[in-house]
């Protein structure tokens, strides 16, 4: 199998937040990446796949049952086309010398990103320049989030950024299947929202709702 051309950013962050609030750190870091890419001109070609995957829109409209590229994350029956896996955000929380810290790794699939940029007519920065821009954007977003949590009472760690996060998750509002890690269906319905702890809300056809943590399920368009 050919190696994937990836850009990797590694950061050591020490946001001044409670350790229990680190649960939202992957989403906040992903927001920083997407904000940076949108500022470069990629607009609606990039987004976040819940909870913190980096995704891109496919070049050709999806056809239910049609052939899909290797990066596609949706079911074969889905017409949802914002399903190319473009990258990952990994966060390892640990005790630092001056309090809670996190080792953050952002990986970006460069061919997928380049395809999204080409569809927008955008020339990407040189590789090292792009790496620095992404790292700076992630660090700035985390600092902003930590400051929000420090200056206003928040019932959950996602609360200060939830509205902006909504706007970056293209799968919201679409029909999805919530699958256990071994592939068993846990819920099927509309991806109707997120709570202040980042849990996905799936509304079934009968109106019943389930709130599902990312540790327990993955969500795919159907």
Model-derived features: where do they sit?
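Primarily the active-site beta-strand->alpha-helix module of PP2C/PPM metal-dependent phosphatases
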Residues: 1-16
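Generic structural signal marking isolated hydrophobic packing positions
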Residues: 1-4, 53, 70
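Long, positively charged amphipathic alpha-helical accessory segments at protein N-termini or as interdomain linkers
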Residues: 13-45, 57-222
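Beta-rich nucleic-acid/ligand-interaction surfaces
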Residues: 50-58
């Amino acid at each position: 199998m050919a190696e994937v051309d990836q850009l990797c950013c590694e950061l050591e962050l020490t946001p001044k937040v409670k350790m229990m609030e680190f649960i939202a750190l992957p989403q906040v870091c992903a927001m920083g990446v997407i904000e940076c890419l949108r500022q470069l001109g990629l607009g609606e070609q990039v987004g976040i796949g819940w909870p913190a995957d980096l995704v891109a829109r496919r070049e050709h409209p999806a056809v239910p049952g049609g052939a899909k590229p290797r990066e596609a994350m949706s079911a074969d029956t889905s017409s949802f086309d914002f399903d190319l896996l473009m990258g990952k955000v990994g966060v390892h929380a640990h005790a630092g010398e001056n309090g809670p810290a996190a080792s953050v790794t952002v990986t970006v699939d460069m061919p997928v990103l380049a395809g999204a940029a080409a569809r927008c007519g955008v020339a990407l920065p040189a590789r090292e320049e792009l790496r620095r821009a992404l790292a700076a954007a992630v660090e700035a977003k985390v600092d902003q989030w930590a400051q929000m949590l420090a200056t206003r009472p928040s019932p959950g760690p996602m609360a200060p950024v939830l509205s902006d996060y909504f706007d970056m998750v293209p799968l919201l509002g679409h029909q999805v299947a919530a699958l256990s890690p071994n592939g068993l269906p846990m819920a099927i319905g509309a991806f109707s929202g997120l709570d202040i702890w980042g849990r996905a809300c799936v509304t079934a056809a009968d109106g019943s709702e389930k709130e599902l943590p990312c540790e327990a399920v993955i969500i795919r368009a159907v």
